[in-house]
Structure formats: C-alpha cells, structure tokens
C-alpha cells in the first residue's frame, strides 16, 4: 500500500537568484513542493519511510501509543498505520508547522478513504520540546532532530527515553556529517551529484545549502550514539545508510 499524497508541485523554490537567501522554514511554500523536494534531495527516503513501518511493527505493543515526532506530511505516520497490526495501538503525529499539520490531515483522510483497518491517528500542532509524552512503545523521528538546537537534543532524547515502555524503541533518521574530512567531502560531493541527477541546478543546490546552513546542524553517527547512551538508551544500531543519510534504532 503506497503512501497517499496529492500530486506534488515541482520544487522550484530556489530556482531564481535571491539577493538574500533567508533561513529555511517549513511554511506553505515548502508544503506545496515537499514530496517532490524530499524525493529529489534525500537518497533512500522511500526505503527509510517504508521500513520504519515494518521495523516499528516489531516493537509496537498492544494498546500503546506510537509517536511520529516532526511528522511533516505524515509519510511515517502512514507507514506505521499500514504495517502495525498490534491491537489497540494509535499513532500521534506532532509537528510545529501549521501548514504541515493541515496538509498532513488531508493526506490521512485520503488514506482512510482508500484503506480499511488502519490505526487511528491524532495530529498535534506543537513544539516537540514542550510536549508531555504519554507512555509509548515506539517513537519515530525522521530527519527531525537535526533541526533541534544542539543544546536541546539531549533533553529531548531523555524525555523520549523516560516515556518508552519496556521492549519499545526509538527509530531516528538523520543526515550525517563525518569526522574524517576526506570522507565528509566525498559523501557531500556524491550527494550533490544525486541532486544534480534529480534535476536540481547548481544555483538551486547552492541557495538551498545557504538556507539550511543555520537551521539544520547534522551530527556524526558517533555523536548520535554517545548522546543516545547518555540519554539512557542501552543500545544503538544503525540499520540503514545511503550516502550521508542514515537511520538507527535505539533500545531502552
């Protein structure tokens, strides 16, 4: 069962020269092109989304809450609803962008109309740093933590760890940076080649990089691992990587 979306507008947000490139925000302009943007910018994204549902089903406990923190348009929420079969589970999707939550709700209504026996879902427009988490068997954060201020990441992960039920898991996907300068340069260049192959111009690539450089701050895998262990998780395993994009599972 595929993800349900509208036909996305083509991402042309950075196609024209901008005298001053503003910081990237998840506003209505981004929402209109987001499915196209993410597909053309993040290698392996469909595989990650689909398998968060598959892997999440292994950790979901009956009659528990499953969180999609930073849910954007609800791709992970839809995947969890398709794959999790545990009795009494429900998904809570959280995002601080009103435009994202509004469009996400439309996509979920469309999914409900197309498929039967999906998990119930609730959408919350909120800052995940201020959210009081219910006891949960699964938390997914798909390219969300990298937009949280670095000095607030550990506190957020501690809150998630406290809310996790025994046998639960956190699935965390992030863009990575690399401590080795040559490895970082190689994978950065290969990612740029991926974007070129998907139709982005040099101008679009450069301007989007400028828009993101102050708001998206990636960590190395080792930094993620050390922070997750400091937050109280017992084990961290990377299950996917494509170029400089990866996903990991952290167990309580």
Swiss-Prot record:
S-adenosyl-L-methionine binds at residues 45, 70-72, 95-96, 127-128, 142, 209. Keywords: S-adenosyl-L-methionine, Transferase. The keyword S-adenosyl-L-methionine applies. SUPFAM superfamilies: S-adenosyl-L-methionine-dependent methyltransferases. GO terms for molecular function: carboxyl- or carbamoyltransferase activity; S-adenosyl-L-methionine binding. Gene3D superfamilies: Vaccinia Virus protein VP39 (3.40.50.150). Belongs to the class I-like SAM-binding methyltransferase superfamily. Cx-SAM synthase family. Homodimer. This is Carboxy-S-adenosyl-L-methionine synthase. It comes from Pseudomonas paraeruginosa (strain DSM 24068 / PA7). The gene is cmoA.
